[in-house]
Amino acid sequence: MSVRHVTTDHAEIRRWVEERGGHPAIVTGVEGEEGILRLDLPGYSGQEFLQPVGWDEFFRRFEAKALAFAYEDDGRYFAFVDRTPRRV
């Protein structure tokens, strides 16, 4: 059974991605937009729309958007989630 984790630790995120043969990327957006963060993992579709970026640039954008990384330890599921606490 997969266990879901949520982290903001850069080393943990990078390790998870690299263990799956992936690398950081962005989806090039509309002119003037910064691009949407993505991870390019082998076998996923849409790779023709991805632009590789370095880890420093990836994490700069990750922090600027106040994201966290949700993932399963034994699979390839991941999502970028808002790390800002929600008010009820």
Predicted regions and their residues:
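A charge-rich, low-complexity, intrinsically flexible signal that marks solvent-exposed coils, linkers
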Residues: M1-V88
